[in-house]
Amino acid sequence: MFCDSFAFAQVMSCFGCFGGSERSRHSPNPYDDDTYSHDSGETSNPGGDDEEGEEEEEVEELSRSKRSEEILKCKLQNGLVCRQFPVKETNKLTRGEDEDGNKTINEFVRERKIGSGSYGKVVLYRSTVDDKHYAIKAFHKSHLSRLRVAPSETAMGDVLREVMIMKTLEHPNIVNLIEVIDDPEFDDFYMVLEYVDGKWAYDDSGPPGALGEITARKYLRDVVAGLMYLHAHNVIHGDIKPDNLLVTSTGRVKIGDFSVSQVFKDDDDQLRRSPGTPVFTAPECCLGITYSGRSADTWAVGVTLYCMILGQYPFLGDTLQDTYDKIVHNPLIIPEGLNPRLRDLIEGLLCKDPNQRMTLKAVAEHPWITGEDGAISEYCCWCKRKAEEEEDQNHS
């Protein structure tokens, strides 16, 4: 999944708004322990819910997480996954060293650590089977089981849900899960992910820290394509932000980190509490009211675009509460002289009213997005191809 120093935030780290970027408490990328989350001890909700209301929220969110897990288990048990090849599941772990003294797990040879977070670490390994590199997220099950992310939920639940979600998905703009290694005799748990060894197609036009329109358009097209696929499969990412977008050597963007994602049975994507990164949080999420997960993801796309174009956050306060207040109440400021089509797109994505906010379908067809490449077409995914093949067979 991970590439060395190729998160958007690191590319733009020369600009102050990214140098002090706040991490979601779940996010292992860019690998530092989190410093600014919903559980920071500050008031996280301008609506000011009382303790009874917070308890009700907790029960509701726990129920939502359990429903996500039940939906995912049902999909996996019945083969309802959008993957041509299933994720490999390995229940036997063998540790050792190669002839050069490098540590090994099964057929993977350790090369170097490429990151760490509050849950575990990410290490670059090379496979002796295909000689390819893989990014392996390593966890200790005992640590995850003790680590509370909510009064009734542990980090182990987050990781297992992330694994189940990634087992059901396959898309060129989404990081691919290759294998899960979970030996009951060991405390270790491994997620083997594709390694994105990319170089930035960085265009230094525009303000310091920004990417410029050409690169931003290219990247945003990939983000929208991947997110449209997720939403079509009833998956809400929940934490779209530059840190979770990785770029390949060919300039393709891949969405990663599904640790706070949720799955729905149908179009009912209503959520109550946002576990994502505060500065990317939609206004309705700040108010402690029920909101649409899809619409909140779309707002986060808007914040990401704003960052890519202008090199700063649209709303940022000195404290968590101040940030939420600005997201809810402050007007959106866009500098004069910006491309009118780009301005229109940013305003549509960052519309505070979720009912008036631009949809991803509208974004895919927006003039600034289409440019010379045309509208973003719907991806013909594995489950869609399979359904079409079955339909053709029934007609033949």
UniProtKB/Swiss-Prot annotation:
Record field: compositional bias (Acidic residues): 48-60
Catalyzed reaction equations: L-seryl-[protein] + ATP = O-phospho-L-seryl-[protein] + ADP + H(+); L-threonyl-[protein] + ATP = O-phospho-L-threonyl-[protein] + ADP + H(+)
InterPro entries noted in UniProt: Kinase-like_dom_sf, Prot_kinase_dom, Protein_kinase_ATP_BS, Ser/Thr_kinase_AS
Cellular component, GO annotation: cytoplasm; nucleus
Region (Disordered): 22-65
Gene3D superfamilies, sorted: Transferase(Phosphotransferase) domain 1
Induction of expression: By geminivirus (TGMV, CaLCuV or BCTV) infection (at the protein level).
Summary of activators and inhibitors of this protein: Activated when autophosphorylated at Thr-154 and inactivated when phosphorylated at Ser-261 by SnRK1.1/KIN10.
Record GO terms (molecular function): ATP binding; kinase activity; protein serine kinase activity; protein serine/threonine kinase activity
Cellular localization per UniProt: Cytoplasm; Nucleus
Domain Protein kinase span(s) in chain numbering: 108-369
Known tissue expression: Expressed in shoot apical meristem, leaf primordium and emerging petiole (at protein level).
Other observations noted: Functionally able to complement the yeast elm1 sak1 tos3 triple mutant.
Assembly, per entry: Associates with the SNF1-related protein kinase (SnRK) complex. Interacts with AL1, a geminivirus (TGMV) protein essential for viral replication.
Protein name: Serine/threonine-protein kinase GRIK1
Organism whose genome encodes this protein: Arabidopsis thaliana
